[in-house]
């Protein structure tokens, strides 16, 4: 009986050993398969490189993306374009109708990143699982009020008034915390389908008393809505980052951080900020209101001539119109004490050079000014690229090509880039100081004048671009996202369908 029991126990032990051994082998094989599978699965960055395309979602706004006469433009667009070039792939852009759509696309992993100009605080409040690049831009949330009404000094002053803010922003989250902690009577409307321009229009027209917007978009739009005035800063400045889908590996985020560090170190980021935001403070309240009024009342009479001259000399008509406004406020009979006359305020020598018989004739003046500007621009060094070439041509139009070249030489002597407007505009004011202008070929010049001249024209031009921006049509840059993509093996595959339609839409002004 004892022997039988021992035999049974021995057989049972052998059976259990076989089971354990088999289980261990199975688990080991499964682990090896999983490990091999993980090793063979391409990273996010590798998939982008294999496809040859970076997929980015953005929104239509002056600080992010818009369609200009020459195609796509905007700070976030430029940044994304440079990142795609850094990766050596094509940029494929989608334009979301609203932030809800952008978040949906991110969460469903239909894009590689979102460049929508939002802070980490705002995006995290909507979806905690989203991930972010390092910061590359700072914005300040501002409280606005309508000029002519009492200026609020603190949040308590907004209680009882009509307040509107953009939805899904850090400002909205901040107000909810304030309401819960100390101001239970605070109420506001969160506008889910409005851009900053529309919100500021509501303040301009008196439909709302207060609004909260970010500083970058306020500065860009304030010339168009001059009654919408800054009251005070709502909270600490916010840092802007790119937003990445949840669940992906870190390869693309790490590459984005490398890129952001590089453009900070080499000056590219400062250059883009100067290009899109470096001139936005040039119009004060009175100047902005006057300009908007003149666009409606004076410009229509001369617009056809500006367009004809622009076509002849291959210049953007809105730039020519902006020059004309800076010179005379579109007054055809303007005359200065120094003898310059007409809508483009031509000097007598310039008029003779351009074969202008009557400087007070608007058509002759516009064609003369356009031809003269075109001639100056052609003399600017060919190695200077746009938009710096245009800004320097404007400076030379104002102060003379010789003085511009002196300023470029001074910039180079100081270790600055003589081919970048952001550096040359620092050197131009030195032409007023004897210790500097005695070293130049052409001597003294009122160097601050061309700096202000260019800044003013850039601001006038921006407003005209936004007020005359064409509606996007089929075939815009946003549509190439739905084109078949080619993989590394040469096969084509359709991009997965997006749950909601996408289109490029002009901003509401």
From Swiss-Prot:
Q: Which GO terms describe its biological process?
A: cell wall macromolecule catabolic process; cell wall organization; peptidoglycan catabolic process
Task: Spell out the family assignment given in the record's similarity comment.
Answer: In the N-terminal section; belongs to the bacterial solute-binding protein 3 family. In the C-terminal section; belongs to the transglycosylase Slt family.
**Signal sequence span per UniProt?**
1-40
Alphabetized UniProt keyword annotations: Cell outer membrane, Cell wall biogenesis/degradation, Lyase, Membrane, Signal
Region Non-LT domain, as annotated, extends over 41-280
Question: Know the name of this protein?
Answer: Membrane-bound lytic murein transglycosylase F
Q: Name the InterPro entries for this protein.
A: Lysozyme-like_dom_sf, MltF, Solute-binding_3/MltF_N, Transglyc_AS, Transglycosylase_SLT_dom_1
Report the locations given in the UniProt record.
Cell outer membrane
Question: What lineage is on file?
Answer: Bacteria, Pseudomonadati, Pseudomonadota, Gammaproteobacteria, Oceanospirillales
- Span list, region LT domain: 281-509
Identify the domain of life.
Bacteria
> Gene encoding it?
mltF
User: Its Enzyme Commission number?
Assistant: 4.2.2.n1
Which residues act catalytically here?
Answer: 327
What exactly does this protein do? Murein-degrading enzyme that degrades murein glycan strands and insoluble, high-molecular weight murein sacculi, with the concomitant formation of a 1,6-anhydromuramoyl product. Lytic transglycosylases (LTs) play an integral role in the metabolism of the peptidoglycan (PG) sacculus. Their lytic action creates space within the PG sacculus to allow for its expansion as well as for the insertion of various structures such as secretion systems and flagella.
- Primary location recorded for the protein, binned into one broad class: membrane
């Amino acid at each position: 009986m004892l022997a039988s029991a021992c035999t049974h126990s021995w057989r049972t032990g052998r059976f259990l050993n076989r089971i354990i051994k088999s289980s261990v082998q199975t688990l080991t094989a499964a682990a090896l398969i999983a490990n091999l599978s993980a090793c063979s699965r391409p990273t996010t960055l590798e998939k982008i490189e294999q496809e040859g395309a970076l997929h980015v979602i953005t929104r239509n706004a002056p600080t992010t993306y818009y369609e200009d006469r020459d195609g796509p433009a905007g700070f976030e667009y430029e940044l994304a374009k440079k990142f795609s070039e850094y990766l050596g792939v094509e940029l494929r852009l989608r334009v979301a109708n609203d932030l809800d759509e952008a978040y949906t696309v991110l969460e469903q992993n239909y894009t590689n990143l979102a460049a929508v100009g939002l802070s980490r605080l705002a995006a995290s409040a909507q979806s905690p699982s989203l991930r972010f690049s390092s910061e590359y831009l700072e914005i300040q949330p501002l409280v606005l009020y309508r000029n002519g009404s009492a200026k609020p000094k603190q949040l308590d002053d907004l209680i009882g008034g009509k307040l509107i803010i953009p939805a899904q922003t850090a400002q909205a989250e901040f107000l909810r915390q304030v309401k819960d902690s100390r101001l239970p009577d605070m109420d506001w409307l969160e506008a889910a389908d409005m851009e900053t321009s529309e919100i500021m229009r509501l303040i301009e027209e008196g439909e709302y008393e207060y609004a909260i917007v970010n500083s970058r978009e306020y500065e860009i739009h304030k010339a168009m809505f001059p009654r919408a005035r800054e009251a005070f800063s709502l909270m600490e400045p916010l840092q802007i980052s790119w937003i990445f889908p949840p669940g992906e590996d870190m390869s693309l985020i790490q590459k984005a951080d490398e890129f952001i560090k590089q453009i900070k170190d080499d000056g590219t980021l400062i250059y883009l900020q100067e290009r899109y935001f470096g001139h936005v403070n040039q119009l004060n309240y009175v100047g902005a209101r006057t300009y908007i009024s003149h666009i409606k009342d004076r410009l229509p009479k001369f617009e056809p001539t500006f367009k004809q001259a622009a076509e002849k000399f291959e210049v953007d008509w809105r730039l020519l119109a902006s020059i004309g406004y800076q010179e005379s406020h579109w007054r055809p009979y303007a005359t200065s004490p120094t003898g310059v006359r007409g809508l483009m305020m031509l000097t007598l020598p310039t008029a003779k050079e351009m074969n202008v018989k009557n400087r007070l004739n608007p058509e002759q003046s516009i064609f003369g000014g356009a031809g003269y500007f075109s001639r100056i621009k052609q003399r600017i060094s060919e190695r200077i690229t746009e938009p710096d070439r245009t800004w320097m041509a404007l400076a030379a139009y104002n102060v003379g090509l010789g003085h511009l070249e002196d300023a470029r030489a001074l910039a180079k002597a100081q270790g600055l880039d003589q081919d970048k407007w952001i550096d040359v505009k620092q050197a131009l004011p030195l032409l007023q100081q004897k210790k500097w202008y005695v070293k130049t070929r052409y001597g003294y010049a009122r160097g601050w004048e061309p700096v202000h001249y260019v800044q003013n024209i850039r601001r006038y031009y921006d407003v005209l671009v936004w007020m005359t921006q064409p509606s996007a049509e089929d075939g815009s840059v946003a549509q190439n996202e739905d084109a078949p993509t080619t993989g590394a093996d040469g096969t084509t595959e359709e991009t997965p369908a997006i749950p909601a339609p996408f289109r490029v839409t002009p901003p509401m002004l």
